[in-house]
Amino acid sequence: MKQLFLVFILFGAFIANAQDKINQLDDKGNRHGLWRGTHKESNRIRYEGTFNHGKETGVFKYFDDTKSATIIATRDFSKGDGSCYANFYDQKGNKVSEGKLVNKLPEGAWKYYHFESKQLMSQEFYKSGKLEGTRKVFYKDGTIAEETNYKSGIKEGNSKTYSEKGQLIDSHIYKNGQYDGIASYYDGLGNKIYEGNYVNGKRVGSWKFFEKNKVIKEVKAAKFGQELIKYEQRNAEEVTKT
């Protein structure tokens, strides 16, 4: 009985000693060694990672607020330059997104995945936390759905969207986040249906309507909306007849 009691005492001392080595500070008040954070209300584990005199090192793990403590994110600080490579997961373990963080801001290439799938949904590029370069969106089969250029987080330059069969749906030009320049629209089968110009996000000049890639009508921008309704009604009637 005394031996059993002694075992419990020693085990308790071991646990207490191990806990004393968690969430420690160095002599300058910086976090050092293994740290574990908890969710406020449940007190369940929220994250776990190792600090070296205030700097994150190795891989940090982040957990959801459930009894199973599912890993929903990891951050790898192995490079030692303050940046980290982050992975985010859903509660079933499927990867949601991944990319580099610098000063907690996205940097370089970031990838996002379709729901519960390994198939890429979009790819973006960042500079100091702002979109920079071409952002691409994909259908679940990998076909390109959209590609738009960004500069300092704002749409700038060419933008195109495509059907699931890879056919062009529309093409625009952006300037400071607004349509500015020629815009073309297609029926999803490769046939152009109308086209015109934008300036500062507003339709200007003459807009052309097409059938079988030939101009059938040209109207002023102010009357484009009315003509578009007529055009779509006429096409709907023709589809009904067939």
Regions found by a protein language model. Name each.
Residues 1-22:
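Bacterial Sec-dependent N-terminal signal peptides
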Residues 16-242:
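Glycine/tyrosine- and acidic-biased, solvent-exposed loop/turn segments at the edges of beta-strands
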